[in-house]
């Protein structure tokens, strides 16, 4: 695979709308190099997990001037509702049935508020050859990695 200089784009992806009509959106970064696989990486499904967005900021600093084969698609804050409320779960005022963003993949375009939000991120995951979901544990947790 040939590595080529990265072309970086950042776009807002609308996931849904508040009852007021305001958009709920996430920022999607694309780092496109030469031909090759696509990797999707996201962070902050839980709003108090801050290490993932920080790690993606560091990754951005390395990728923006790099030469790579393939594409990296990054969503630093997958759940802006929980993130903006500094809450592990999405506040129940938004979705009393599905407050844990991480438990409702791949979402449902006709489902609850959060299921609809997740359903609008899912195409990015589906289009990738590999997907990485970054989480942060509490200090007393044992370190672990899960993969499928």
Where are these regions (language model features)?
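Structured catalytic-domain cores with a bias toward divalent-metal coordination
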Residues: 1-148
């Amino acid at each position: 695979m040939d590595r080529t200089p990265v072309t970086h784009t950042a776009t807002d992806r609308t996931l849904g709308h508040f009852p007021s009509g305001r958009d709920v959106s996430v920022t999607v970064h694309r780092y496109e190099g030469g031909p090759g696989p696509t990797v999707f990486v996201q962070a902050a499904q839980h709003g108090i997990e801050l290490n993932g967005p920080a790690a993606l900021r560091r990754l951005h600093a390395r990728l923006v001037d790099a030469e790579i084969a393939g594409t990296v698609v990054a969503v630093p804050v997958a759940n802006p509702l929980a993130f903006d409320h500094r809450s592990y779960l999405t506040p129940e005022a938004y979705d009393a049935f599905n407050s844990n963003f991480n438990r409702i993949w791949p979402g449902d375009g006709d489902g609850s508020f959060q299921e609809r939000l997740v359903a609008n991120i899912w195409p990015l995951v589906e289009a990738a050859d590999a997907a990485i979901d970054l989480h942060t544990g509490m200090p007393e947790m044992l370190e672990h990695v899960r993969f499928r």
